[in-house]
């Protein structure tokens, strides 16, 4: 066991004994004027509702898949448990506590005795259950210039990963082939399949540039329950 891993384990044991959470704040870049984020107090209040020892049975209903943001995490943040899922997407996992996620680390999975495949299966099932609650009125229909754009925003950071369940997403956006963008964790945009890719890249960048936690520039093609991945180009994206 490496020093950092050992120190984190000792810190968890100390918190268990004290029966309270501790918080460390790592300041990041400011968000854009149109991005709303939870306050520190809201995050701490949510953490205080969680048990000190997070067992699999307790947190399994709230585990969801997460796409990795572009901006690197602080080096003192826990390592993330990650998997690569079709069609070549890197996926991590978080415990949804409302205003934030608790990162699932390899260490936590080892303590639970739960393998990554089982965590992925449960996370996707939880995701699909959330998607079942999306109503037609939750999808905003608009246009930018002469391009129709449909938007879906989730109250938590799950919307971006809805593409991992293309059948369920088809019930929301329709089963036709379409281009889907996920510039932020809680936002999906649907464009016509024939939309100009330079326009799509510009739109992605316009939104992602406001969010320091933006996702990697990529486009998803969905339709008939299938999912494929398209690059948006190295010159785009708010890295």
Where are these regions (language model features)?
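Short Lys/Arg-rich cationic patches that frequently serve as NLS/NoLS or arginine-rich RNA/DNA-binding motifs
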Residues: 1-22
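Short, surface-exposed loop and linker segments with low hydrophobicity and enrichment for Pro/Ser/Thr
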Residues: 81-85, 168-175
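Short amphipathic alpha-helical segments
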Residues: 115-119, 160-161, 195, 199
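Short amphipathic alpha-helix segments
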Residues: 157-171
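C-terminal structured domains
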Residues: 174-179, 186-239
């Amino acid at each position: 066991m490496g020093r950092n891993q050992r120190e984190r384990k000792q810190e968890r044991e100390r918190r268990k004994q004290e029966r309270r959470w501790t918080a460390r704040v790592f300041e990041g870049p400011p968000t854009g004027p149109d991005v709303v984020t939870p306050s520190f107090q809201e995050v701490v209040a949510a953490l205080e509702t969680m048990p000190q020892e997070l067992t699999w049975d307790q947190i399994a209903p709230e585990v969801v898949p997460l796409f990795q943001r572009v901006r690197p995490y602080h080096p003192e943040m826990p390592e993330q448990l990650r998997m690569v899922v079709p069609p070549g997407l890197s996926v991590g996992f978080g415990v949804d506590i409302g205003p934030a996620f608790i990162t699932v680390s390899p260490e936590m999975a080892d303590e639970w005795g739960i393998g990554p495949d089982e965590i992925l299966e449960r996370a996707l099932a939880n995701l699909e259950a959330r998607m079942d609650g999306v109503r037609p009125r939750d999808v905003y229909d608009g246009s930018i210039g002469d391009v129709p754009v449909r938007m879906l925003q989730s109250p938590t950071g799950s919307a971006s990963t809805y593409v991992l369940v293309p059948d369920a997403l088809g019930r929301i956006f329709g089963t036709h082939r379409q281009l889907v963008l996920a510039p932020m964790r809680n936002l999906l945009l649907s464009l016509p399949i024939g939309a100009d890719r330079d326009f799509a890249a510009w739109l992605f960048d316009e939104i992602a540039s406001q969010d320091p936690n933006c996702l990697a520039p990529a486009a998803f093609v969905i339709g008939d329950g299938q999912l494929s991945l398209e690059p948006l180009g190295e010159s785009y994206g708010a890295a």
